């Protein structure tokens, strides 16, 4: 076995290993130190020989088609398995401390942040985003430099990675003062998060699905006539003609003049996002073009995103059929295109079985050592070609899966097709934290849950005609928005969503527009509208957080441990988080007014227990009431409020005087200062779109607050005169 140290840095250590021949095992310890302390020791690296195989057609192909939850899938029935060469599986073991928290590794379903004494199957599927980056509280992180499926396992003080297929192997160890520093080292190796346009941080309205350009226009009119801010409306699947799954040409009978419809949205300062798929019906023109070019993955109707020419062809279809209509964003759905073996059936399979099923299916069409990275190459093709053809528009790619480094390609990742329940919502808080600790800055979810109904099959969406149980289709609300219990859940979820990096409503079974939950004067409707407006009041702060992510590697949605590493209690909290440096967010995750089935609840306290970390003081955002850190409070949690606290020393730029209907021409006019500690914040501003900022065309206003003097300054005399300065606290 040949070991190569790839660099001489002390904070980024890159080790590569090449097997000589046969089975090889290296048990010579390799230690990694932070200061005078050994924080991690490699105890074993083993290459285990294995055969790889490929699937070829036996004679004339017998092509079969079937509909799945991920659309139309084609496969060749008469496949033959042939040897394809020699490879290895890799076993990598470390000895670590017994007390540090083990975090990251992507986003999953179980809502568990600390992975100690657990097994994590790192693969790509609906509701799973596998990122082989382990972040710890002991000054180190580990990045596995592989595109293969793999398994992580922790047992007491032992950490093990089992990589399914490799020909050689390397990994990185990052060493730093804190978790934030280690994430910045990750970005140094994999690329910085890209800068999205300002509108991408506004409210995004989606549903499964708008069925015509008239519905798109009516939705835009609904927002503008009611004075509700919105920045984007989304066209989900089935924009194509009947039976032409994945074709990028819109059905002309329902969308007779798409450019005109998009212009209608643009005239109201509303952007347009379109769902696109990598799998295409063999009957559609896009598929035929790929087949003629020989750019499909074997045994599939999925384009070969690993191939540069295939990526160019896919983009050319997007450009001429979608982008030229004026579309502002692409939604790359089903970007893990071989997950149907998991995403089917009445029974949720055990984790090992799910992992093997997806891996076995993927192996029939992809190279075995690249089963996790399809979405990465898919995003790469969108980004590189978009940047060449539309430099005036920043890339926006909403994608269901991603892999290490996908953040440099203009991606927004969402958590997949989750169910509508408070249990799911609570787990999603932890999974959003997990995603951020894995390097994913722009994370979001389906506000209200994607699947809403349970067994009232006639209320199902997605053109579902089978009316049979499916393990993933088990929401708590058979009547959807007609059930006040669902309206309560939706409001709580939207409050949570207003404090995520990307603010997006989506789902099936029931409509999602604000007016579906009532009209002015109804507490559900009024609360929805108020939190959308609050999002826009905070937009100068939020857009500045995005700039800090792009320029400095600061993540937006933060575990409490990021800001309070010395608070042991903070490490136990999985249902609160920091949104930037100022806000502690504590979503409400239980019914207080109704239970499913329109059952009104009596005498349920409208309070939420919130832990406020030590090391600073905290202000209730709504009342300004002060609380000492290191305490637990029972915050007011009536439906109109989500518990929200602001840290002492926070400087928060806002747009207060006039809440805009979109992010266009958005400017900060007020700065909120929360007394009790010194503070700082850099207000970022640019044109909001395009890439001129890369040439220095942006401005930074560096606010600095001295609590002793109770003075806010910028270093430039007269700068603060542009803002109303509002102080909170003693």
What does each of the following model-derived ranges do?
Residues 2-22, 26-54, 58-634, 638-640:
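Catalytic-domain carbohydrate-binding cleft regions of carbohydrate-active enzymes
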């Amino acid at each position: 076995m040949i070991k190569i140290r790839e660099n001489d840095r002390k904070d980024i250590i890159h080790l590569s290993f090449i097997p000589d021949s046969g089975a090889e095992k290296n048990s010579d310890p390799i230690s990694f130190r932070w200061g005078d302390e050994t924080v991690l020791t490699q105890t074993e690296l083993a290459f285990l020989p294995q055969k790889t195989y490929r699937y070829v057609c036996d004679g004339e192909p017998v092509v079969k088609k079937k509909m799945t939850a991920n659309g139309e899938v084609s496969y060749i029935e008469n496949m033959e398995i042939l040897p394809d060469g020699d490879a290895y599986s890799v076993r990598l073991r470390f000895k670590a401390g017994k007390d540090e928290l083990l975090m990251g590794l992507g986003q999953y379903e179980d809502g568990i942040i600390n992975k100690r004494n657990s097994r994590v199957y790192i693969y790509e599927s609906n509701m799973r985003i596998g990122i082989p980056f382990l972040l710890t509280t002991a000054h180190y992180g580990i990045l596995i430099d592989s595109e293969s499926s793999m398994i992580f396992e922790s047992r007491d003080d032992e950490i093990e990675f089992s990589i399914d297929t490799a020909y050689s192997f390397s990994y990185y160890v990052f060493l730093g003062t804190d978790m934030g520093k280690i994430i910045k080292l990750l970005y140094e190796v994999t690329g910085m998060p890209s800068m999205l346009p300002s509108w991408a941080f506004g409210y995004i309205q989606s549903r499964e699905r708008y069925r015509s350009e008239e519905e798109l226009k009516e939705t835009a009119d609904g927002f503008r006539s009611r004075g509700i801010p919105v920045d984007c409306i989304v066209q989900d699947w089935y924009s194509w003609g009947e039976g032409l799954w994945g074709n990028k040409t819109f059905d002309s009978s329902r969308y007779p003049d798409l450019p005109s419809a998009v212009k209608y949205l643009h005239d109201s300062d509303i952007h347009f996002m379109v769902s696109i798929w990598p799998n295409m019906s063999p009957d559609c023109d896009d598929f035929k073009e790929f087949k003629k070019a020989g750019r499909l993955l074997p045994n599939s109707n999925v384009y070969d995103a690993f191939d540069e020419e295939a990526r160019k062809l896919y983009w050319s279809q997007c450009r001429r059929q979608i982008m030229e209509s004026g579309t502002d964003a692409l939604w790359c759905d089903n970007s893990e295109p071989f997950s149907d073996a998991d995403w089917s059936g009445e029974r949720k399979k055990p984790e090992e079985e799910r992992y093997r099923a997806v891996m076995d299916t993927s192996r029939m069409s992809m190279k075995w050592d690249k089963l996790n990275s399809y979405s990465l190459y898919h995003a790469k093709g969108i980004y590189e070609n978009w940047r060449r053809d539309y430099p005036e528009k920043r890339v926006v790619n909403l994608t269901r899966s991603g892999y290490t480094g996908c953040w440099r390609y203009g991606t927004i990742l969402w958590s997949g097709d989750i169910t509508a329940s408070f249990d799911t919502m609570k787990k999603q808080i932890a999974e959003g934290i997990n995603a951020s600790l894995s390097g994913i800055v722009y994370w979001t979810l389906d506000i209200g849950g994607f699947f809403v109904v349970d067994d009232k099959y006639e209320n199902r969406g997605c053109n579902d005609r089978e009316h049979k149980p499916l393990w993933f289709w088990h929401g708590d609300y058979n009547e959807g928005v007609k059930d006040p219990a669902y309206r309560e859940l939706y409001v709580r979820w939207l409050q949570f969503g207003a404090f995520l990096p990307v603010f997006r409503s989506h789902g099936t079974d029931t409509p999602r527009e604000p007016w579906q939950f009532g009209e002015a004067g109804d507490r559900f409707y009024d609360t929805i509208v108020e939190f959308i407006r609050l999002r826009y009041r905070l937009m100068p702060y939020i857009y500045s957080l995005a700039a800090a992510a792009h320029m400095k590697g600061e993540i937006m949605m933060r575990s409490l441990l990021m800001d309070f590493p010395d608070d042991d209690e903070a490490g136990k909290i999985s249902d609160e988080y920091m949104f930037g440096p100022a806000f502690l967010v504590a979503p409400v995750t239980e019914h207080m007014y109704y239970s499913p089935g329109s059952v009104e609840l009596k005498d349920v306290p409208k309070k939420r227990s919130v832990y406020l970390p030590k090391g600073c003081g905290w202000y209730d955002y709504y009342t300004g009431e002060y609380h000492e850190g290191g305490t637990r409070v029972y915050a007011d949690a009536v439906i109109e409020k989500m518990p929200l606290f602001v840290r002492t020393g926070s400087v928060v730029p806002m747009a207060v005087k006039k809440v805009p209907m979109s992010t266009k021409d958005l400017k900060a006019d007020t700065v909120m200062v929360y007394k009790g500690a010194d503070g700082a914040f850099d207000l970022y501003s640019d044109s909001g779109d395009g890439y001129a900022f890369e040439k220095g065309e942006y401005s930074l206003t560096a606010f600095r607050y001295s609590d002793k003097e109770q003075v806010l300054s910028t270093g430039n005399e007269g700068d603060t005169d542009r803002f109303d300065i509002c102080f909170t606290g003693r």
